[in-house]
């Protein structure tokens, strides 16, 4: 039986070896998406084991049962040599009884892990289960969610490719359609997105993500800024949809002038008691001014279950909105897969059956070639890689001017290799964003301008030029006097003031 100190030593060794293997795993170059996903899952498994070992170590150091303290006292007391020989005797006795006992060092186990990573078996190459439609983490498979969506009551009938474009635009759906069936659809969609994220991005801490989403949602919900769920007005009447606006009344006496019938209809719209004299009804109705239904005294309501129902509806709406908030976040995380899915579906719909079969055969052959062992490419001059994954020829590298670097200060000192990439970047998002930050339009006037100072000075010059070319009504607008003489506006006004016309 291992001693407490030996268990602690073994746990410390395992932690260090796990850290070393995780570092090597993360530094290993992944050439395909399959390799990246499998590597992330191996890393997460080691992280989970690391946390488990750390928890065991903490329990041993806490020493709630006092065994560690007893062992320390035994080996550090006055009879330490007697204790040493006693334990040595126990070890010899154990090996005498079990002469063929095999002990596998921990280093051997981790060496086997490294070998399995370098020469993976067929099972190790498919660590995660994906459907054929998902293409091992490349695409989304939302067909079940799509069928659930188009079967919702009063839902718009659309095709699958359109659904892929708008399935996250939940804020456009009217609140009247967000019922229990709609909530079940959201739960189904969210469950798939969470499961897919867990398979494609296993290192994503979903517990931390949930806390972040919840904090942001609570803040937006309280402020009334959450998309699709605007904050209700402060008046209790407008909150309940009544047609009487209390903002025009400053006292209950003014409300009393409306009469018994009008006050009764307004109180009924709120679910309040509508009996009593004219003064009592007016005072009861005026007491709701500037208040929400939840803040009113329950004794004012005709039936308490109605107020509970209103509060229940608010909680139900908040639950639905929180589901939407989670879906928004996961869709943003899976933005790349969503775009690839849209392109893949669009491409499949435009192809014939024979072309689809050929594409599937190509994908199978590509996956088989990806699974082959990748050799280390010799690339001492750091040349760009071609379509085959190998460095392009040096003469082609020189021909395209890829040895020339162009720096653009507007793009945040980003470096572009080759004149072609440099010229193309003026129309791309990075340069356009830099120009927008400077408050300058990205027009043809600023082609080949890479310095911020040059762009600002050119923009000032262009503004002056445009100002000088702008039409000046005082000097360019022409008038005709009574004698038929044509003069500009300024001269005409001067002559008119002097009475010379």
Swiss-Prot record:
One of its GO terms (cellular component) is U2-type precatalytic spliceosome. Belongs to the SF3A3 family. It is found in: Nucleus speckle; Nucleus. The gene is Sf3a3. This is Splicing factor 3A subunit 3. Component of the 17S U2 SnRNP complex, a ribonucleoprotein complex that contains small nuclear RNA (snRNA) U2 and a number of specific proteins. Part of the SF3A subcomplex of the 17S U2 SnRNP complex which is composed of three subunits; SF3A3/SAP61, SF3A2/SAP62 and SF3A1/SAP114. SF3A associates with the splicing factor SF3B and a 12S RNA unit to form the mature 17S U2 small nuclear ribonucleoprotein complex (17S U2 snRNP). Identified in the spliceosome 'E' complex, a precursor of the spliceosome 'A' complex. Identified in the spliceosome 'A' and 'B' complexes. GO terms for molecular function: RNA binding; zinc ion binding. The modification Phosphothreonine is found at residue 475. Its main location: nucleus. Residues 342-374 are annotated as: Disordered. It comes from Mus musculus (Mouse). Residues 355-374 have a biased composition (Acidic residues). Residues 342-354 have a biased composition (Basic and acidic residues). The modification N-acetylmethionine is found at residue 1. A motif (Nuclear localization signal) lies at residues 175-179. A zinc finger (Matrin-type) spans 406-437. Keywords: Acetylation, Metal-binding, mRNA processing, mRNA splicing, Nucleus, Phosphoprotein, Spliceosome, Zinc, Zinc-finger. The modification Phosphoserine is found at residues 54, 121, 295, 299, 365, 367, 369. Component of the 17S U2 SnRNP complex of the spliceosome, a large ribonucleoprotein complex that removes introns from transcribed pre-mRNAs. The 17S U2 SnRNP complex (1) directly participates in early spliceosome assembly and (2) mediates recognition of the intron branch site during pre-mRNA splicing by promoting the selection of the pre-mRNA branch-site adenosine, the nucleophile for the first step of splicing. One of its GO terms (biological process) is mRNA splicing, via spliceosome.
């Amino acid at each position: 039986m291992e001693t407490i100190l030996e268990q602690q030593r073994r746990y410390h060794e395992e932690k260090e070896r796990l850290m070393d293997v995780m570092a090597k795993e993360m530094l290993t170059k992944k050439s395909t998406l399959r390799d990246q996903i499998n590597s992330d899952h191996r890393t997460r498994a080691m992280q989970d084991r690391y946390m488990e070992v750390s928890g065991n170590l903490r329990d041993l150091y806490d020493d709630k049962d006092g065994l560690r303290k007893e062992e320390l006292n035994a080996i550090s007391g006055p009879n330490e040599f007697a204790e040493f020989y006693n334990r040595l005797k126990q070890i010899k006795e154990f090996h005498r009884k079990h002469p063929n006992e095999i002990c596998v060092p921990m280093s051997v186990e981790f060496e086997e892990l490294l070998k399995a990573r370098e020469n993976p078996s067929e099972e190790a190459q498919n660590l995660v289960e994906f459907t054929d439609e998902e293409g091992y983490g490349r695409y989304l498979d939302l067909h079940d969610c799509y069928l659930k969506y188009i079967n919702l009551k009063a839902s718009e009938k659309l095709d699958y490719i359109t659904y892929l474009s708008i399935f996250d635009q939940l804020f456009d759906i009217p609140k009247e359609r967000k019922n229990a069936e709609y909530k079940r659809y959201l739960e189904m969609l969210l469950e798939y997105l969470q499961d897919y994220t867990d398979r494609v991005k296993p290192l994503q801490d979903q517990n931390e993500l949930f806390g972040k989403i919840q904090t942001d949602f609570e803040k937006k919900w309280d402020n009334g800024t959450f998309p699709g769920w605007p904050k209700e007005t402060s008046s209790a009447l407008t909150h309940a949809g009544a047609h009487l606006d209390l903002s025009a009344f400053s006292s209950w006496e003014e409300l009393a002038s409306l009469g018994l019938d009008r006050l009764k209809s307004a109180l009924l719209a709120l679910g309040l008691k509508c009996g009593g004299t004219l003064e009592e009804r007016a005072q009861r109705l005026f007491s709701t001014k500037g208040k929400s239904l939840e803040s009113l005294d329950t004794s004012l309501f005709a039936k308490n279950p109605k107020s509970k129902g209103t509060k229940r509806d608010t909680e139900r709406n908040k639950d639905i909105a929180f589901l939407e908030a989670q879906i928004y976040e996961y869709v943003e995380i899976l933005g790349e897969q969503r775009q690839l899915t849209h392109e893949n579906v669009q491409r499949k719909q435009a192809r014939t059956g024979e072309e689809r079969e050929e594409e599937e055969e190509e994908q199978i052959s590509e996956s088989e070639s990806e699974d082959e062992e990748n050799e280390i490419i010799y690339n001492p001059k750091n040349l760009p890689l071609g379509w085959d994954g190998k460095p392009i020829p040096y003469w082609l590298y020189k021909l395209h001017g890829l040895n020339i670097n162009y720096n653009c200060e507007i793009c945040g000192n980003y470096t572009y290799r080759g004149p072609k990439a440099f010229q193309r970047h003026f129309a791309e998002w990075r340069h356009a964003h830099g120009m927008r930050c400077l408050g300058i339009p990205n027009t043809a006037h600023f082609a080949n301008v890479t310095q911020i100072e040059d762009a600002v000075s050119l923009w000032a010059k262009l503004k002056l030029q445009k100002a000088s070319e702008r039409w000046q009504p005082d000097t360019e607008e022409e008038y005709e006097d009574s004698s038929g003489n044509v003069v500009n506006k300024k001269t005409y006004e001067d002559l008119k003031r002097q009475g010379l016309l």
